[in-house]
From Swiss-Prot:
Tissue-specific expression: Expressed in roots, stems, leaves, flowers, siliques and seedlings, with highest levels in roots.
Keyword annotations from UniProtKB, A to Z: Auxin signaling pathway, Brassinosteroid signaling pathway, Cell membrane, Cytoplasm, Developmental protein, Membrane, Nucleus, Stress response, Transmembrane, Transmembrane helix
Effects seen without this gene: No visible phenotype. Longer hypocotyls and greater fresh weight. Greater production of lateral roots due to increased lateral root primordium initiation and associated with a stronger auxin signal in stage I lateral root primordia where PIN1 and PIN3 accumulates abnormally, as a result of defective PIN-FORMED (PIN) auxin efflux carrier proteins exocytosis. Strongly inhibited by the auxin influx inhibitor 2-naphthoxyacetic acid (2-NOA); this impact is partially eliminated by the auxin efflux inhibitor N-naphthylphthalamic acid (NPA).
Residue spans crossing the bilayer: 241-261
InterPro entries assigned to the protein according to its UniProt record, in alphabetical order: ROH1-like
GO cellular component: cytoplasm; exocyst; nucleus; plasma membrane; vesicle
Induction: Rapidly induced by cold.
Known partners and oligomeric status: Interacts with GRF6/14-3-3lambda via its N-terminal region. Binds to TTL. Associates to the exocyst at the plasma membrane and in small vesicles; binds directly to SEC3A, SEC5A, SEC6, SEC10, SEC15B, EXO70B1, EXO70C1, EXO70E1, EXO70F1 AND EXO84B.
Function: Together with TRANSTHYRETIN-LIKE protein (TTL), prevents plant growth and development, but by opposition to TTL, regulates positively cold tolerance, probably in a brassinosteroid (BR) and allantoin-dependent manner. Controls lateral root initiation by modulating exocytic vesicular trafficking-mediated PIN-FORMED (PIN, e.g. PIN1 and PIN3) auxin efflux carrier proteins recycling, thus influencing polar auxin efflux transport in lateral root primordia.
PANTHER family: BPS1-LIKE PROTEIN (PTHR31509)
Localisation: Cell membrane; Cytoplasm; Nucleus; Vesicle
Protein's name according to its UniProt entry: Protein BYPASS1-LIKE
This protein's record includes keyword Cytoplasm: yes
Amino acid sequence: MPATDFQGSFGRSLLSLRRDQVDSSTVVSGSSSHHEPSTMEVELDSFQRQVAEKFIDLNASSNDLLSLEWIGKLLDSFLCCQEEFRAIVFNHRSQISKSPMDRLISDYFERSIKALDVCNAIRDGIEQIRQWEKLADIVISALDSHRPIGEGQLRRAKKALIDLAIGMLDEKDHPSGTNLAHRNRSFGRVKDSHHRSIGHFRSLSWSVSRSWSASKQLQALASNLATPRPNDVVASNGLAVPVYTMTSVLLFVMWVLVAAIPCQDRGLQVNFFVPRHFQWAAPVMSLHDKIVEESKRRDRKNCCGLLKEIDRIEKSSRLMNELIDSIHFPLNDDKEVEVKQRVDELVQVREALRNGLDPFERKVREVFHRIVRSRTESLDSL
């Protein structure tokens, strides 16, 4: 669906919904006064439109869907939405403490705490990918184009390729990968200044445990997530809508991270659906459907992560492994040229990982700390 198509499928805005409510009341009362949108209504509608525009942009770049660069853009979009949502909560904090907003905002922050464990699990997955990068380095070094290729070099490359293939097995087939999760510390140990946050969040102390399940965590994040009831929208002066919006965006972002990056007990079976009358529903559901289709591809069904770079390194290393198996000595010129070509391909994949993982990890860390800060500020202000 082209990005321009979403412009016509924005759905009904918060302002139009509010106008309908006002029009209904004026018909009952017999009044014909024209309703002018308040500053608050304009602010809340602007937030809905911003979320929609962010996801329209992500659809426009969906040729790079699930690449490190694309997921980085998704995280940037989340951070922008989170900052706008934080401003809305701060600007209307007097209403946040009243019913039904006290219940709705508390529910949002409870879900956001669950997202912290997902961020920690993704950090573990990044470390796992770095181990694969090191194994690719061994293969590249062993088959260096500046030296003649001998049997010893092939054996060294072959061993690294076998280790890489084993490491890239889905953890259901190879559960030893979960050792990373037990060993790594979480983002929250970087600074001690957020002492109150550390007291509030167990997720800040250590990374996820060996028994932790990404699939179950996503299900917990999605549990009982429902569109705001009309009476809650009215009683909260519309504030229930951005809370639902931000909760849905949070769930979608965490779902994408689990889909893309290796982590314990991956699973994408989450009931995620947004009614089309929300401005941002069409672009979000379009991305959701594309990712589900990608996960159903025959060659991706049992992979450890849908990240584009993982697919590339898996294919490149498999082709290299098959080539090495076909080599007999003495090595003829054609085979030597073919080996060099495969090495060059592996170098490109390795460089993509090397250049992309660090910025990606920094963004995941920023998401983690932004969620913590938002929750802490809420505790301080309520």
